[in-house]
């Protein structure tokens, strides 16, 4: 039986963020698993669009999503001061208004990553409402503690550390831990490609508007024994950050093996991943989400590309599936990072069942969870 899903989010589309890509990829596999999906989201940026052709072209997909971009006549995205406050006010008002207009009778269940949409949907409907919890905040702690008392509320936590925060309210029926996954359609021939002598970081060069400390990876690479025989490729935006990294390299190093490539298209970025040998995870331990709760999309793309993975020894990274394959380094320790890069070349990859980290597997688990 075909399930009709309403996916409501405060994300906007198209966007180059990992979160928006994850949403589109999840929807693709809901559709492949015989679901009809409607995506409702705010037109809150100049680049926002409700054109299915633009969305499909941007994400290089042909999936038949029912697109519903909703007007967003609120300050967030338009006013560039007090952005945190503007976000919360606009998010609340847009969610309340949008949920009121949703035609409840045509959907079997709802999925969201928005606290306020989760809250307002549970006040409106008796149908199941699934919340994807990727991080924690003071507001989220309050809302989830209220919402998990509802019999039709269900929560997907990104890792066990997140789930444990709400242990008093979790039951086997209303909660599950599911890490992110990867679209294996993008990496079908990774094991058969000739690999270049490349170490790669791919992703946003900032996280929550703060630096990912990419300069640390550059410095550590230069200090390693690999800097003469390997290339370090940094792929991602925003453009001003990638430009500043180019300036940093030009001012400090005469090394043609450091390549700051900026934001690439999805196909070009995937090709670079498939041909690399080592993938780097890097983050700041001062950010609670990065340190404890992250399940990075790029990690699963690295595994699907048959890369060795080098990462800081954060609790979140140790919770990742197949983390026994990760070569860990001490955070902010250049020597430890350089040693990890060198060690990655001699370590053998342990067995990885790629199907178990696929988005298809993840979506099947979500559908089983919903039917509990």
Task: Label the predicted regions.
Residues 236, 245-273:
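Nucleotide-activated donor-binding/catalytic signature segment of Leloir-type glycosyltransferases, i.e.
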Residues 161, 181:
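Carbohydrate-associated surface elements
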Residues 19-30, 217-220, 298, 366:
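Short amphipathic alpha-helix
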Residues 9-16, 36-89, 118, 237-241:
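N-terminal strand-loop element at the rim of the active site
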Residues 6-8, 156, 192-222, 232-233:
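Conserved donor-binding/catalytic core segment of Leloir-type glycosyltransferases
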Residues 332-335, 341-372:
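A charged, aromatic-enriched C-terminal amphipathic alpha-helix characteristic of glycosyltransferases
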Residues 208-212, 267-272, 279-301, 311-319:
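Nucleotide-sugar-dependent
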């Amino acid at each position: 039986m075909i399930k009709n899903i309403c996916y409501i989010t405060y994300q906007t589309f198209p966007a180059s963020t990992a979160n928006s890509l994850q949403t589109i990829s999840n929807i693709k596999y809901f559709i492949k698993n015989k679901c009809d999906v409607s995506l409702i989201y705010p037109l809150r940026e100049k680049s926002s669009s409700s054109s299915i052709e633009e969305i499909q072209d941007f994400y290089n997909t042909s999936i038949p999503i029912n697109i519903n971009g909703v007007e967003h006549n609120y300050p967030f995205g338009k006013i560039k001061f007090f952005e945190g406050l503007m976000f919360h006010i606009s998010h609340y008002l847009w969610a309340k208004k949008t949920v009121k207009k949703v035609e409840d009778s045509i959907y079997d269940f709802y999925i969201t990553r928005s606290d306020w949409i989760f809250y307002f949907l549970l006040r409106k409907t008796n149908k199941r409402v699934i919340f994807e919890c990727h991080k924690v905040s003071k507001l989220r702690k309050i809302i989830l503690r209220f919402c998990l008392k509802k019999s039709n509320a269900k929560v997907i936590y990104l890792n066990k550390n997140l789930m444990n925060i709400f242990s008093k309210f979790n039951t086997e029926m209303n909660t599950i831990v599911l890490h992110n996954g990867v679209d294996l359609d993008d990496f079908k021939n990774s094991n058969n490609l000739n690999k270049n002598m490349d170490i790669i970081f791919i992703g946003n060069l900032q996280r929550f508007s703060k630096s990912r400390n990419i300069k640390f990876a550059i410095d550590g690479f230069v200090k390693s024994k690999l800097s003469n025989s390997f290339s370090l490729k940094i792929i991602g935006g925003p453009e001003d950050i990638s430009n500043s990294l180019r300036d940093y390299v030009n001012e400090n190093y005469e090394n043609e093996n450091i390549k700051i490539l900026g934001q690439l298209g999805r196909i070009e970025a995937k090709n670079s991943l498939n041909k690399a040998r080592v993938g780097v995870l890097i983050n700041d331990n001062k950010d609670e989400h990065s340190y404890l709760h992250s399940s990075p999309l790029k990690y699963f793309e690295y595994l699907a590309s048959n890369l060795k993975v080098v990462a800081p020894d954060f609790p979140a990274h140790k919770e990742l599936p197949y983390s026994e394959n990760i070569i860990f380094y001490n955070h902010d320790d250049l020597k430890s990072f350089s040693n990890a890069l060198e060690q990655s070349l001699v370590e053998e990859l342990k067995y990885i069942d790629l199907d178990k980290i696929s988005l298809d597997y993840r979506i099947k688990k979500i559908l089983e969870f919903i039917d509990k």
